[in-house]
Amino acid sequence: MRSHRRPTTVLVAALIAILAFAAVAVAANPHFLRASASGPDRNGELSVNFKIAGLGDNETITVTASADATAVYACRNNGGNFPSDPKKTEVSGPVSASGDFTSGRNGQVSGSLTLSPPATTLSCPGGQRRVLVSVSYSNVEVTGGGDTAAIPGTFSRVFFDI
């Protein structure tokens, strides 16, 4: 009788090990359930929202949002007007933001990252201050856990018509 128990015990142990590894393999498959963007807001910032599934419980993941951005800055006088020939500049380049997010008991993470307009070095003369005239974001995407989600469209806002 003992000879029959030993193979059964080994078989049960092997099945438990296989199921444990299968659960880890399924949990280690991060993927985006959704990704979207909204804005730009009144500060020219774009909000990138996402939901990732396929993580283990209480697993921390680094998520990065990125885009190609173009911003126009100009000098505006203290009266709130632009001179007839305003000093202005256009700045283009990649922008990104990253954050660490921890999954809950369901192996999912929902979050948001904020992209800011590219910085400028525009210097305004006395009596004037630099303002953001317009901003545009394209090729927006969010990455995390080895997966990438593209967010189609161009997200633009014009603050002043100069």
For the regions a language model picked out, list residue spans one by one.
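Long, low-complexity intrinsically disordered regions enriched in Ser/Thr, Asp/Glu, Pro/Gly
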Residues: 2, 15, 158-159
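Bacterial N-terminal signal peptides
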Residues: 11-22
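Mixed-charge, low-complexity intrinsically disordered regions
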Residues: 4, 24-27
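Mature extracytoplasmic or otherwise solvent-exposed domains
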Residues: 27-162
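Bacterial N-terminal signal peptides that target proteins for export
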Residues: 2-12
